[in-house]
Structure formats: structure tokens, C-alpha cells
């Protein structure tokens, strides 16, 4: 998604050169062991929601003259980190349901933090019936090595949007305390 226009297109979030040049004869195999660290902001793919439009894959490309199939895409399963999962669980305990997830092109800015990979993920939560003054809540995470920043876009009926931010350390989080804090912070 970009502005008001929705489309699907790939967004490269990192590149890693894997191997130098080598010769490969017919019927010969070549192994190239590797280990890599995904960017902290890699979008989550493993979410329990109605519409998950998030896909992350490892795209491999070999520079082979006249190759029939020199490309490959291997899907990756990206799970929420413990702070992300704590926020999702706390919002569910506040009476919200995770409805959809997508990735938007651009940079996310929230007070003292900003995204760095050229895109950011939005998780859309919708209220259960008893939270009738809320249209939706959009949540985006910007994770660093030290903490996870959260940007909340609160869309209220008849009152428009407003934003709140929260930063969580990468230490165990008490869900009951976080739930109470989010209720107050977001006016739930």
C-alpha cells in the first residue's frame, strides 16, 4: 500500500552476497552454507487474523548465462517477538480482535523512533461490539536491538484519528499490567 493506492509488489529489505564466482559442470552440485540475520523490522507473517497480506521470502538469484531457472523464492515464517506478542495479547484482552495485516511502502515515524527498511507493517484491530466508540486501531512495530517501539493509530467514530506511542524493553512483560496501561493510553 502506498498512500491511497493499494497494489502488491515486492520490497527488498536486505541483500546478502553469498558466494564468489565458481564453475559448475553438468550434473555437478555446489553447496554454499550460509547464516544470516534478518533485519529487526522484518514483517511478521505468522499471525492469526482474517486477512494476512504479509509475505516474506528469501529470493535467491544465480548469475548463470542462458539459465532456465536461476531464481528461487523460499517463504519464511516470521513470528512475533515476545514484546510484539505481548502487545497483541494485551489488545485482545482489551476487547479487540486482529482483523488484518499488510505492509506499506514508506517510512514510519513515531516521536523518537522511525523505521529503516523502506516499508512498515500495519496490524489492524477491530473492536468487539462493546467498544462501539472505536472504528479501528492500527498498530505498527519498529524493533531495535534494545527495545520494541509501537505506534498506535486510534480511529474513533466522530472524532477522527490520533496517535500514541509506546516503547517496550526486551525483557519479560507482565500482560495484566500492559493491558491496564494500554486501556489507559488508548482510552479503551
Predicted segments, located by residue:
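A beta-strand/beta-hairpin structural motif
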Residues: 6-48
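Short aromatic-acidic-glycine turn motif
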Residues: 1-9, 158-159
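C-terminal interaction module
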Residues: 107-188
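Compositionally biased low-complexity segments at domain edges in trafficked proteins
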Residues: 89-115
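Intrinsic-disorder/low-complexity, polar/charged segments enriched in Ser/Thr/Lys/Arg/Asp/Glu/Gln
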Residues: 29-33, 71-73, 136
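Internal, hydrophobic beta-strand segments that form the core of beta-sheet-rich folds
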Residues: 35-41, 48-67
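Short beta-strand elements
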Residues: 65-92
Amino acid at each position: 500500500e502506498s498512500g491511497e493506492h493499494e497494489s502488491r509488489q515486492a520490497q527488498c529489505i536486505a541483500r546478502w552476497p553469498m558466494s564468489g564466482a565458481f564453475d559448475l559442470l553438468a550434473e555437478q552440485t555446489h553447496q554454499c552454507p550460509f547464516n544470516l540475520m534478518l533485519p529487526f523490522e522484518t514483517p511478521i507473517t505468522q499471525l492469526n487474523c482474517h486477512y494476512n497480506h504479509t509475505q516474506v521470502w528469501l529470493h535467491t538469484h544465480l548469475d548463470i548465462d542462458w539459465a532456465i531457472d536461476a531464481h528461487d523464492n523460499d517463504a519464511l515464517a516470521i513470528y512475533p517477538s515476545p514484546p510484539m506478542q505481548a502487545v497483541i495479547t494485551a489488545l485482545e484482552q482489551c476487547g479487540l480482535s486482529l482483523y488484518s495485516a499488510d505492509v506499506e511502502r514508506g517510512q514510519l515515524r513515531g516521536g523518537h523512533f522511525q523505521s529503516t527498511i523502506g516499508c512498515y507493517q500495519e496490524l489492524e484491530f477491530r473492536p468487539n461490539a462493546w467498544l462501539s466508540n472505536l472504528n479501528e486501531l492500527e498498530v505498527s512495530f519498529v524493533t531495535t536491538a534494545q527495545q520494541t517501539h509501537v505506534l498506535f493509530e486510534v480511529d474513533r467514530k466522530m472524532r477522527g484519528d490520533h496517535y500514541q506511542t509506546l516503547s517496550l524493553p526486551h525483557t519479560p512483560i507482565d500482560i495484566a499490567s500492559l493491558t491496564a496501561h494500554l486501556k489507559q493510553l488508548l482510552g479503551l
